[in-house]
């Protein structure tokens, strides 16, 4: 048996800052190649790799305290090593911010998932990580066809949600809402997908905007520490992710996800800013048309559509930052294989 790349496992070694992580390679008995580039970055290459092979980035830990995806990824990599998990897609597994994970913190100095645009940012630990991740994505997608590129950036929500799992589809200049991607969400029993209406600065947006990748930010349950996650609630997602890696069809029934469009983004403009609901309000809490739910200066914040719902509310953001997204359910259809709505 070939000696493992890991002393214990991909996740455990990544979080053990007392050991050095040097670049290394391993070829398994089934011909699958593992390439460890640095702490928390592992490429997996199938024995047969062609121009049609999917090139899939599976990232987690962009927010260090969102650990359920790390545990799922660690289990998949163990099964790849043992030969139990079939590999037909080329994959790049990333645990993005180990130092933040060890601190049980979302981030240390700045929100990493807001640093993937081309704007100037103050130097921070997170900015250095973002710059490294951009290069990893560039190198991974080099000489690949755009239609083979996927990026699933896996997170957990910091608040309760009316949808235990949901995804955010970035808005880009490329067709990145393919039927195959939505079929994956349905197979994974992801309850809802939120269709962004403007560019952002997230990791998944970066891959979609710059490389045309089928990319999603995926919210998988609630924040918890390693070992305390309820992974049973993510079984369908785990199976579908494994099927994606194996390029095999699901054996379980799909569940169509609810589609939401972003109706508007609430940006904090004044020091005198507040919501009328508690900090622990659930994502996707809805309001009736005209209902006031906060204020920004002397301007009331109110629902402009019936059943308009709030997602990612944060009354504590700095002036000029996004304080919430407002979303509405929307009917969708496919045009030329792409999900669209009127």
Curated annotation (Swiss-Prot):
Co-factor binding details: Binds 1 zinc ion per subunit.
CDD domains named in the record: M14_ASTE
Protein name per Swiss-Prot or TrEMBL: Succinylglutamate desuccinylase
GO BP annotation list: arginine catabolic process to glutamate; arginine catabolic process to succinate
Record's function text: Transforms N(2)-succinylglutamate into succinate and glutamate.
Reactions the enzyme catalyzes: N-succinyl-L-glutamate + H2O = L-glutamate + succinate
Name of the gene encoding the protein in the UniProt record: astE
Family of the protein in this entry: Belongs to the AspA/AstE family. Succinylglutamate desuccinylase subfamily.
Cofactor: Zn(2+)
Keywords linked to the UniProt accession: Arginine metabolism, Hydrolase, Metal-binding, Zinc
PANTHER family according to UniProt: ASPARTOACYLASE (PTHR15162), SUCCINYLGLUTAMATE DESUCCINYLASE (PTHR15162:SF7)
InterPro entries documented for this protein: AspA/AstE_fam (IPR050178), AstE_AspA_cat (IPR055438), Aste_AspA_hybrid_dom (IPR007036), SuccinylGlu_desuccinylase (IPR016681)
Biological source species: Vibrio campbellii (strain ATCC BAA-1116)
One Gene Ontology molecular-function label: zinc ion binding
EC primary class: hydrolase
Database matches in SUPFAM superfamilies: Zn-dependent exopeptidases
HAMAP family xref list: Arg_catab_AstE (MF_00767)
The EC number(s) this enzyme carries: 3.5.1.96
Active-site residues annotated for this sequence: 219
Binding site for Zn(2+): 63, 66, 155
Higher taxonomy: Bacteria, Pseudomonadati, Pseudomonadota, Gammaproteobacteria, Vibrionales
Pathways involved: Amino-acid degradation; L-arginine degradation via AST pathway; L-glutamate and succinate from L-arginine: step 5/5
Entries under Pfam families matching the protein: AstE_AspA_cat, AstE_AspA_hybrid
